[in-house]
Amino acid sequence: MKLSRLIFILILLHSLSFGVAMAQHVPANNNHDEERACAHQWLLEHGLNTKSLSLSLTYEDIGFLVFEDSRNHCFCVVANKEMWPLLYGPVLAYSTEVALYMNSKPSQQYNGVMKPFRDQLAALKMSAAGPDTATAIYTPKNKEVLPMLGSTKWNQYRPYNMFAPTKNGNRVLIGCVPTAVAMTMRYHQWPERGEDCCYYMMDSKTMATMDFSKCTPLWKSYKDIYFPEDTLDEGAQNLSKLMVSIGLSVDASFSDTGTSASMKNVKPTLCNHFGYSGHIAFHDMRRHNLTEEQMEAILYKELDEGRPCIVSNAGHAFVCDGYSDGFLHYNFGWSGHYNGYYRLMTGRYNKLISGEPPILVKYFISGIEPQQPDGGVSREITLKKAGTLQDMLTDTEKETITKLTLKGPLNGSDIKLLRKMAGANDGFSLDGWRGGALTELNLREAKIKDDKTAYYSKPAKGVWTSYENNKPRKYDFSKSLTKSDWISFKNGPGSRMQGMQIVRTDDDKYFEHYFCQRDMIGKFMFANCSSLKNLVLPITTEKVDDHAFQDCTSLTSIVLPPSTESIGRDPFRGCFSLEEVLLPRNLNVKDGTICEGCSPILRSAKRY
């Protein structure tokens, strides 16, 4: 082994030993024979050699044990025996690709990956649910889908970051999001060349441009793994440039100690610059009100259809690229370290220990695949009656139309469908819908009508304050309101709302519903329409309300019609591709609030 390669391995293992211990290293005299036998048998059944396998109990965590054999590059995580009756199975995770190389202090990576197991086992102890008699949301089509990324073992360090910017005299880390995106693109071997350009800030004062037409990935030249001395390798150099361009496009915050980026920015990067399908969708478990079972169902369906998913636990982005008999396979982008199979859920519990679901995957991106050359579909439709758009389109058209011109009256059901076609991910569905591909929407000759059909709904959050006899009264929807508080809210501020309504369900949950108002682009009307690149508003538009286009991450330009009289708060927050906003000359608005969270080139809105 070359000295530099040995040093690379030692540095990697040292970096993985960072962190705060959450349990205790195993004393030599501990005895867990049944758990060890379980791990041994499990690994034998999954391909390890009978004669050479020799497992060591290297770590005793809270509720489970880590067994590994570094010579055979494997590990197996087994729950303590007393927990087995509460679990889907005693094995929580395993790998036949790599050992964990545990020492007396578990690493930050270890704690990030294993903490969900601690939390789930604690939840099961506190309140285990009975047997699951419900019909499965989705049944996987296969017993297994082999890891689609194969033996890819990339990371964020040298040589992957050799063309990255420098800070404090050091090359910044590539970041987990660009690494996960690059690994997924390698699987698809797409594109041959990038397209268009993006703007980014080199520092607080200097803006630069990235020309993606000069980005030509050498897919056939990329290796499964590179080492620090591979800086002269043509494939390594090309890959580093690709990863840097991805990082700049997703607006990564580069640092020499850790680089971060928003998962929401992945779709516009792939669609706008690398020729990927608009069917890509970002899922946020809490924001989209998804259950653990629903998250798992979508992941399995994507894998069955041959699409790896980029997933995240809120601290690290990685790739889910396969499954086997109840376990999901992850490639963590840590030079192969920790790659293996993990249960998303270990058993059924009735309530949570903390405020968030105790699973490893809390966010993920589905539908990642190249746009087909003939995938664009254009339609022009004139509606004679509001609410009939659904009947004017076939199911295939709803999913595949990329350019749409609409004329005539529109109501809430029409807007709701347009949102779905334009990439808004408003809820869980396994009905075959692949996600919206609509990139260009022309509503110039359309007219928005008053309506009581909600075009958008979301869980109610935050605190509402009303004043009674000059005294404030607060209603906190992050908590359960008392019956008297709810009646007071309904008869007070709730009765005075325009264009929205807050409702209470039988299981004591609260939701905000938003409705169409005549000639108004209402609150959140096109929010999260992540496929939209160009949008022409109705010429009769009189008002644009708060957050109307929030998180339209692919939107590049927009013109507010001359009839527009007012505009609400933060209409374009999170539209990070937005480069141009044209406003009527007499529209009264503070330009500073218009451009927050948009492309760096958009310093202020232009007047006409």
Predicted ranges, named:
Residues 7-17:
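Bacterial N-terminal signal peptides
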Residues 24-58:
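Short, non-transmembrane alpha-helical segments in secretory-pathway proteins
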Residues 47-82:
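Exposed beta-strand-loop-beta-strand "reactive/processing" segments of non-cytosolic proteins
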Residues 74, 83-115, 271, 277, ...:
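Active-site signature of cysteine proteases
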Residues 87-259:
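Active-site-adjacent structural segments surrounding the nucleophilic cysteine of cysteine proteases
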Residues 378-384, 402-410, 436-452, 468-520, ...:
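Structural signature of tandem-repeat unit edges
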Residues 522-525, 545-548, 568-573, 593:
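Consensus positions within tandem repeat domains that build extended binding/scaffold surfaces
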